[in-house]
A protein has these predicted regions:
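Accessory, non-ATPase domains that flank or precede helicase/AAA+ motor cores in DNA-metabolism machines
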Residues: 1-419, 426, 432-452, 487, ...
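Short amphipathic alpha-helix segments
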Residues: 726-760
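Short proline/glycine- and acidic-rich turn/helix-capping motifs at secondary-structure junctions
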Residues: 750-754, 758-771, 808-817
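Short conserved micro-motifs at the rims of enzyme active sites and ligand-binding pockets
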Residues: 729, 771, 789-791
Length: 817
């Protein structure tokens, strides 16, 4: 239960000190208000577009020393209480941005200081930039910089009273027992067995009371007795949860190699030049899988730390394994803080505080780690920069690469992007040489260290397999490859990017495919639980498909409701039937990795096995380094190729190239077998021939002709509502305003030699209904370099809001479904 405090009463003694002004009753008869010492620009913690801009408040003299940029404050807004964040402080009201016409006599006072500063002035400026760039409210952007658990919130109780609700997550303290100088000379009586045990346990250093009690079955009385004698002392120290993540993975060592390859040396030299130039330049490390990009990161971080600065490393969530973290902690020890979604709330808070206190100087984490309070940031690294997970899926829909580039510019530090399959945007900016004032440089790393070589890639044409009578999910080449792995006692990785048992059920008589009652998506069948599950909203229904006697089609009543297609669970069953019992079959997907540390346990199981097959979805394609893996198989490469999305080919190529790179990373050669019905597709050919240009040349030509990024900026404006008509009418109004605005400005664009922004739609989304909400969207194609966000923001302010209709603006959109 979160701690609560009445706003207009006195705080309880045990609560954090909070200064309050008057109670409501006192305010009616209060003397003249307290003199104003300064003025604050306050962003209300109310995420609505109408209240996005800061408001001016006076800082009473009694708060003058406590009110700082980043402080959470209590203010009155209209007839309610609200929490807000100070983003600027000035001595004269006219100095506040946008508030030079206000009457000082009408300025309200800040009622209370609710927290110490949670972010600094630079973070406030970056949040302002994000708010404008991504057409998001400023409070949403500021929340990114808050500690896990957030800041105090103002909530209205059932009795109508406003109260402060403090974050429920709190720090914890450990009690450490240590010998005093006199204690080292103390000799316990011969009969004092417990005292001797305690003294012996403390000879090598301090130990927590918890560990002592676990080791010796309650030492509390002995500790108290020796503490009274001055033999030991007990100290309370802040416990840093989330620092004890250990792994037995053999490849988690961060030990530096004897020598760097020529490619690694070249990349490191370019990063060092960018660091010394201090212009916020970008270095793209374009290295094949297994080329040693992580070692380049580690070496670059060493130089930054030696210069007294800090470093932030972003890794895709699915790649943020114990193996990845282990390499950084092996090299940099306790100075590494880690952030990912599998940490508990308490662990996230402690890792954040480690960074804020300066105890951690290297942060390794997923997208949100970018907003940690690192002091004197000297290097930002984004590994696997092509990954779509760097794009936030909810407002503010920022891209970590773009925010990192802005941070690098402001902190005058290099931004390093690493990938074996760089995004089209990153490659285009490197071809241009500059983007948004920063220099973009591409460095190639074409070879693997040591004796490792790129794997051979074979294409298994499933059309030919079918014509030869095969009906198995495994082609002859893939079955033979698995047999060789078993004979040699090696390891294999199998990719199939569809979890569940079967992608859908279908009635063989009427063709009905059961869909979600709340979404316009087909339901996925899960064999273990005999349920149909919606992977959009999470709803599920019990079902017994054919040949179960109770199988019934929901439309026609036929019992022939059959499983269609393949999911990872079905492939797992087939592998168990095909391979010997002593081969470990390990499935890794969203269903098998739900528990805490599930990722780590599955990978440790795979690492420890003598012979094993790791089967999984895209999470097995990234960040895994197992030298014993000699075979990678792709069960069906065609799923992602023909989706209605201009990035479908790029995503498919990235996934196939990345998973292929898991093979042959040690001394033994690797082999990749890709099963497909489309062997002539440029994506398949590019992976098979280790020639990226086969795909990228084809892809760029298509994007140039159709005007898609990187040749334009793409904005997706999405609305949703329980009422289909309300959603359609609202987005139609937005489209009309945008078209009218740009039609009127067309002569100005043409005089400047620029294309006029285009509006496509509105239209219903591919997934037209989700969670009982109808969804419509429109696309804006804007010239690169034109700040289209300002035009969109102006139109949204003009159209206003409609009750029951929600809106989201996705600048540089990735998800068009």
């Amino acid at each position: 239960m979160a701690e609560q405090l009445s706003l207009f009463g006195s705080p309880e003694p045990e609560q954090a000190p909070v200064k309050h002004a008057r109670t409501v009753e006192q305010a009616k008869h209060a003397p003249a208000p307290e003199p104003i010492a300064a003025y604050a620009s306050v962003v209300l913690d109310i995420p609505t577009r109408a209240l996005s801009e800061p408001f001016a408040y006076g800082i009473p003299q009694s708060f003058d020393n406590e009110a700082q940029i980043g402080s959470t404050v209590l203010v009155h807004f209209g007839n309610r209480a609200a929490a807000g964040y100070i983003v600027d402080i000035v001595s004269e009201l006219g100095e506040l941005q946008g508030n030079n016409t206000l009457d000082p006599a009408r300025i309200k006072l800040i009622e209370a200081i609710l927290s110490k500063p949670l972010f600094g002035a630079e973070a406030a400026r970056i949040a302002r930039w994000m708010s404008r760039e991504y057409v998001a409210t400023l409070s949403e952007c500021l929340r990114l910089f808050l500690p896990p658990g957030g800041s105090p919130r103002v909530v209205k109780g059932d009795d109508g009273a406003w109260t402060v609700e403090r974050p429920a997550v709190k720090p914890i303290q450990n009690r450490w027992v240590m010998l005093t100088p006199e204690g080292f000379d103390y000799t316990p009586p011969k009969t004092a067995v417990r005292q001797r045990q305690l003294i012996e346990a403390l000879q090598c250093g301090p130990v927590t009371t918890r560990d002592l009690n676990l080791l010796y079955n309650s030492m509390s009385a002995t500790i108290k007795a020796l503490e009274k004698r001055g033999v030991v002392v007990v100290e309370e120290r802040r416990a840093w949860r989330g620092c004890s993540e250990q792994t037995t993975l053999s490849s988690a060592s961060g030990k530096a190699p004897v020598a760097l390859t020529k490619g690694q040396q070249k990349a490191l030299a370019q990063i060092e030049r960018a660091r010394l130039d201090a212009h916020g330049d970008v270095v793209l490390v374009d290295g094949v899988t297994g080329s040693g990009k992580t070692e380049v990161y580690l070496s670059a971080i060493e130089r930054v730390l030696a210069a007294g600065r800090s470093a932030c490393v972003l890794v895709p969530e699915i790649s943020l394994t114990a193996q990845t973290v282990g390499r950084f902690r092996s090299r940099f020890g306790e100075t590494v803080a880690v952030f990912h979604s599998r940490l508990s709330a308490g662990e996230r808070l402690d890792q954040w505080d480690m960074v804020a206190s300066g105890a951690a100087r290297v942060v390794v984490g997923a997208r949100s780690a970018l907003f940690c309070p690192l002091s004197d940031l000297g290097l930002i690294i984004i590994d696997e920069e092509h990954e779509t997970s760097y794009k936030q899926g909810s407002s503010p829909r920022y891209h970590a690469r773009e925010v990192a580039a802005e941070m690098a510019r402001r902190y005058r530090c290099p931004l390093v992007l690493g990938s074996a399959t760089p995004s089209a945007e990153a490659l285009d900016r490197c071809r241009r040489g500059t983007y948004n004032g920063a220099t973009w440089t591409r460095v190639e790393m074409p070879e693997r260290p040591g004796h490792a070589v790129l794997p051979t890639v074979r294409i298994a044409d499933l059309r030919r397999e079918f014509s030869h009578g095969s009906r198995s999910m495994f082609s002859k080449p893939l079955m033979e490859g698995l047999e060789r792995v078993v004979e040699r006692r090696e390891k294999a990785v199998l990719l199939h990017n569809r979890r569940g048992f079967a992608p859908f059920l279908m009635c063989r008589e009427c063709g009905c495919v059961p869909t979600c009652n709340h979404c316009s998506t087909a339901l996925t069948y899960h064999e273990r639980t005999h349920t149909l599950q919606c992977h959009t909203c999470g709803s599920s229904w019990r079902v017994q498909p054919y040949p179960a006697p109770t199988s019934r089609c929901p439309k026609c009543g036929s019992r022939y409701l059959a499983k269609m297609g393949l999911g990872t669970q079905q492939i797992e069953d087939a592998l168990h039937q095909m391979l010997p019992d002593d081969v470990a079959i390990i499935r890794m997907d969203a269903d098998s990795t739900r528990g805490k540390d599930a990722h780590k346990k599955l990978l440790e199981q795979f690492d420890a096995a003598d012979c094993a097959v790791l089967l999984g979805t895209q999470m097995i394609a990234k960040g895994l380094d197992f030298p014993e893996v000699t075979l990678v198989g792709v069960v069906n490469a065609d799923f992602a190729l023909k989706l209605p999305d201009f990035r479908a080919g790029e995503r498919a190529y990235d996934l196939l190239e990345q998973v292929a790179g898991r093979a042959g990373r040690g001394d033994r050669p690797g082999e990749v077998i890709i099963q497909t019905y489309l062997p002539e597709d440029p994506v398949i050919r590019a992976v098979a021939e280790h020639d990226r240009s086969i795909f990228t040349d084809h892809d760029l030509d298509q994007r140039r002709d159709a005007l898609y990024p990187p040749f334009v900026r793409l904005v997706n404006i999405l609305v949703w509502s329980a009422s289909r008509d309300d959603a359609r009418d609202y987005i139609g109004h937005i489209a009309k305003l945008l078209k009218r605005r740009w039609h009127a400005a067309a002569p100005d664009f043409l005089r400047a030699g620029s294309a006029v922004p285009q509006v496509l739609g509105p239209a219903s989304c591919v997934i037209e209904r989700a969670k009982d909400r109808y969804r419509f969207h429109l696309l804006v194609k804007s010239p690169v370099g034109y700040h289209v966000s300002d035009d969109i923001d102006a139109c949204l302010k003009e159209v206003g809001s409609v009750r029951g209709v929600s809106l989201s603006v996705d600048v540089d959109a990735y998800d068009l479904m």
